[in-house]
């Protein structure tokens, strides 16, 4: 299937975008020091 890869890539991209927005919302909280 030509677009078969989009079945994984598109949701993953949306997840990463959402995670990025969440990280920005959290700002510089100390939890990031624990990574």
UniProtKB/Swiss-Prot annotation:
* The UniProt record lists the keyword Coiled coil: no
Q: Does the keyword Transmembrane apply?
A: no
Q: Which InterPro entries match?
A: Bacteriocin_lactococcin-G (IPR021089)
Which spans are transmembrane here? none
A GO BP term here is:
defense response to bacterium
For this UniProt record, the keywords arranged alphabetically read as follows: Antibiotic, Antimicrobial, Bacteriocin
Function summary: Kills Lactococci.
Q: How does it assemble?
A: Bacteriocin activity requires interaction of alpha and beta peptides in a molar ratio of 7:1 or 8:1 respectively.
Protein's name in the database: Bacteriocin lactococcin-G subunit beta
